[in-house]
């Protein structure tokens, strides 16, 4: 069973980067995100209103796997700063991870 992680990502495009490269990476990023969603690695993704960052629920076998085989495969990763917080279910979580017994 994969573990869950809260991942905050801020992407900063280096000054002077060719706009065509930016557009190509963004297009590739969208494709890769769909692939990671299909495998269950990307659960949810949000963008705070008025901010150029994302907050997501990501899944992987462990944190090393999350970095090496998930986040590091993102085309925009070289321009990202990433903060990862491992998560576990809260005893009062009403979600399906804690079915009534």
Q: What is the role of each PLM region?
A:
Residues 1-101:
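Conserved, structured core segments of small domains
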């Amino acid at each position: 069973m994969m573990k869950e992680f809260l991942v905050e990502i801020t992407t900063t495009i280096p000054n002077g980067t060719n706009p065509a490269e930016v557009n190509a990476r963004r297009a590739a990023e969208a494709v890769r995100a769909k692939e990671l969603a299909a495998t269950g690695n990307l659960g949810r993704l949000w963008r705070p209103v008025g901010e150029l960052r994302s907050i997501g629920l990501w899944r992987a076998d462990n944190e090393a796997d999350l970095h090496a085989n998930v986040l590091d495969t993102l085309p925009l990763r070289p321009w990202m700063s990433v903060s990862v917080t491992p998560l576990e279910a809260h005893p009062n979580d009403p979600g399906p991870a804690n079915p009534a017994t």
